[in-house]
């Protein structure tokens, strides 16, 4: 199976276009003001103009109000939503777009029950648990905590980079991988060489 690749946290149009040319499957835009990768609606509109056909534009939200999400959707052509907070299944379903739900994995968390609760999601994005931080920490978690029989596609995140993504895929065999800080020079500033090396690492695992 070919592992899908999402790069999250774009803030520059040229870097998003470079990622698309390298072959990523999805690009993530962050709508969460505390994040250094947060983009305004105007920035997001410009970034989406660099998204070619068949590349998914993903909007990331963290405990946003319903109106905040709808305001973005009225103006930005997103095709998938990603929720990173304490959103309920009913909340996530109400926007009429497919969504993935992020889970901060730690010992004792029942991922099978979580997948049952969020059966309407297109997948679960598994990230590292860091107290008080909703994601984008650059920390990895214990992959053995992932049940082999999860009923939803797994999007593996959390501390992935060009040096460990091949190992991660060989261990977990996820549907997709998600990276942000692992391919950056600084927060929100993507590194072309790191993105290319990350994609090569994914392809090496898929052979």
Roles of regions detected by a PLM:
Residues 1-207:
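Conserved N-terminal beta1-alpha1 strand-loop-helix module at the mouth
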